Amino acid sequence: MKPTTNGGLLASQSSSSFSFPRFRGQLPIIFSANNNQKKKNLPNPNVVTLCLHSHSNVSSSQIAVTRRAILVAPPLLAAAASLFLSISSAASAETSAESVALPPVATAPPPPPVEKEEAITSRIYDASVLGEPMAVGKDKKRVWEKLLNARIVYLGEAEQVPTRDDKVLELEIVRNLRKRCIESDRQLSLALEAFPLDLQEQLNQYMDKRMDGEVLKSYVSHWPVQRWQEYEPLLSYCRDNGVKLIACGTPLKVLRTVQAEGIRGLSESERKLYTPPAGSGFISGFTSFSRSSSLNMNPLTQIVPFGPSSYLSAQARVVEDHTMSQVIVQAVADGGGTGMLVVVTGANHVEYGSRGTGLPARISRKIPKKSQLVVLLDPERQFLRKEGESPVADFLWYSAARPCSRNCFDRAEIARVMNAAGRRRDALPQDIQKGLDLGLVSPEILQNFFDLEQYPLISELTQRFQGFRERLLADPKFLNRLAIEEAISITTTLVAQYEKRKENFFEELDYVITDSVRASVVDFFTVWLPAPTLSFISYADETIGPNSIDALRGLLGSIPDNAFQKSLGGQEWTLSLRIASVIIGGLKLAGVGVVSSFAAVGSSNALYAIRKFIKPELGVGEQAKRSPMLKTALVYGGYLGTSSNIRYQIIAGLIEHRISDELSSQPLLVNMISFVVRVANSYFGTQQWIDLARSTGLQTQKSVTTSNQIPEVASQSTVEYSTTEEASMDDLKNQ
């Protein structure tokens, strides 16, 4: 029985209908689904209608309903009903979704820009730990948190020999504390012992900008000139940023009276203001301390326990501490419960010590010691703290410009780098082990060393040759710079040779070969010698020889590798040392030039001899007049020691380190600058050498013989070696 169809599926948003397949003897059935949701008067918009159509061309005999048609019709009706009900539900859902407006998507506001924290280049040590003070790593967050938890922060600076480095640290600390105090809505004040308290009104006028720096300077005329220059940046910063300035020093008149006559020389009113009350224990404490110190230093002169000068100085110390303590307590009270006070004074006034007779001990009766924190700036010594002893301070803070010979980096960070790399200390080279023992190897340097060892060739060089290791640790791109220099050396040398020699290029080929080989060898040393190095073994430890040799090697080790090199590890190089580096570097390159010239000219002579042996006719038709090697060596050595030395020192120190460090975020630009500078240096340097060689007679440009010139007759026996490296032609007689 073959089915036939009368129609297809007719679908729209309002209604859908189609005809069921009709078999023989079956009535034509059309299914219609009405989905008109716009008619509100219909109780049910989804209507399914089954219609029996009678066609005019159907006979009455064909309308008979068979048993098979009755059995097939119900399942077809059920399937059609479920199909169109799902279609109508989807259409109604789509219509309702369109009619209901979606709520606007709430966009989160962009996060506020995170202010980049100022990099701290100074070195900080935690002096509160047992044993040797522990260097704090790059993350100084714990230090700042501890400082902010204190109400009073003492900055103890050098008293006998004040340095500019202390003022740099003070400005750095005040600047960072102010930034954090603003975030926590705290008022920051700065108390200065250098200003006597009777100058407070002048400081107020300076803060209100009613007085300029020159007028304020006139009130401290007893200061040395350099002292005002050191304090001026700190004072200007406080005035411009609203950090209150407080004078806490003892008036000069009172201090000089005590130093000359003692406390007895003060008037009754001055004693009440500047001396501690009777029974406080501080005067007796100082007396006993002075007495015991004198007895220990002079055990054989116990009849005179202490001299009058030490006694008067102790009394002056009492007056200074008492005066500052009173001003500090009052300033803390004026600052409220959240204010913060930074006190800049001499280190002897704030050290904790064994007796605790300084400012923290005096103020601890009103302000607990846990709210006071002591920072010593650039102390000369680092004391080992034993169990049961009080620390000398909470932190030791060193300027980045101060040299560091021990315990310079956080040993905990070093251990983390070692563990992450899976390396053992005894498997490292001896100089790095020595540096780890002294605390001179930074985590970054150690990580760079492990990264370099991932390459087999570089690992072999760093393990076997200390010179390569020292240069790669100081500059991981040293081999790249060396490869660039050697790659462009041959090319630029040949181009410059051709530019200068033109049509005589092939006639003067021996000159070209000599200069090219010599340039390739010398370029290695011009990159090697001025390159910065990083060594952890002193010269005295490397050799066991006479003291004079050790002293000479130590002197050479104290000179920078180039005049523009940055200070490494806090080592400060003076102008005289940088000038000495130019002289020493010139002597080294001059020696390289002399040795390379002997080798290059000797090889050129050997090459010519071999060429003459292979082609004997060259000895008749072309006889070379060779130059003495000594003159060439001296001229070339002088050229390297002057022109090349200065040019390569500028490239190594100024271009590839100082400028490259400023552009470290753009490595492609840095490499392009290095490449362009080295190409230009090699090209113009070669031209300078050619001009110098010709001006000194080492090389003279050949004259080209024209066709109408008559060649001069000369015999082979008359051809001798001249004092130039010029190859002259012995022309045969034109018979």
Curated annotation (Swiss-Prot):
Protein's membrane topology: Multi-pass membrane protein
Region (Disordered): 714-735
Compositional bias per record (Polar residues), positions renumbered to this chain: 714-726
Keywords on record: Chloroplast, Developmental protein, Membrane, Plastid, Transit peptide, Transmembrane, Transmembrane helix
UniProt-listed Pfam families: Cofac_haem_bdg, RETICULATA-like
FT transit peptide: 1-75
Membrane-spanning intervals of the chain: 519-539, 582-602
Main localization (coarse): plastid
Superkingdom of the source species: Eukaryota
Result of knocking out the encoding gene: No visible phenotype under normal growth conditions.
Subcellular location: Plastid, Chloroplast membrane
GO BP: any one term: chlorophyll biosynthetic process
GO cellular component, one term: chloroplast membrane
Function: May play a role in leaf development.
Protein family membership: Belongs to the RETICULATA family.
Name of the protein this chain belongs to: Protein RETICULATA-RELATED 5, chloroplastic
Record organism: Arabidopsis thaliana
Gene of this entry: RER5
